[in-house]
């Protein structure tokens, strides 16, 4: 699926978020390559604030820990669920749609919805939230290191 971002089908509307378009896992996995999935999921051009002041109550809760384990198993420990791109080191479970303090305070279903969650590495998680992806890896070719 190599469609321009403007043509991507998104999963719907989040009523609480002023009609913000909702990303979802079932759409993300239709993109076969890691780069396409990363581009679909990037949030660095979407304004949001992280609810760090209350998020620890979520991330230490038994329900979250169970949900987190289920998502890691579903994605087979692979970055963005792309088979073969295994995560070595800490595995982050990313909310595709940013959560709010209110979501945590009322224990909104969006916190635990598998359609709103995906396994990522720390580098990928940071790329989704804070910066464009690093330079793509270029496949080496014979003679590409010649100086003259």
Which ranges hold each PLM region?
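A boundary/linker detector
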Residues: 1-66, 83-89, 136-148
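Alpha-helical and His/Cys-centered functional microenvironments
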Residues: 11, 20, 98-99, 129, ...
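Short cysteine-rich loop/turn motifs with clustered Cys
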Residues: 63-97, 121-123
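Histidine-centered nuclease catalytic patch
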Residues: 83-118, 132-137
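A detector for short metal-coordination/catalytic motifs
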Residues: 114-116, 123, 127-148
């Amino acid at each position: 699926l190599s469609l321009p971002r403007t043509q991507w089908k998104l999963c719907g509307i989040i009523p609480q978020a002023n009609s913000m378009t909702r990303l979802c896992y079932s759409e993300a996995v239709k993109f076969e390559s890691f780069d396409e999935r990363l581009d679909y999921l990037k949030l660095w051009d979407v304004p949001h604030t992280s609810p760090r002041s209350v998020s620890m109550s979520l991330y230490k809760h038994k329900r979250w820990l169970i949900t987190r384990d289920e998502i890691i198993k579903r994605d087979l420990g692979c970055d963005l669920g792309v088979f073969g791109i295994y995560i070595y080191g800490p595995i982050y479970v990313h909310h595709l749609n940013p959560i709010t303090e209110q979501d945590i305070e009322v224990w909104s279903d969006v916190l635990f919805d598998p359609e709103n969650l995906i396994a990522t590495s720390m580098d990928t998680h940071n790329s989704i939230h804070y910066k464009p992806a690093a330079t793509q890896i270029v496949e080496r070719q014979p003679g590409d290191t010649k100086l003259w």
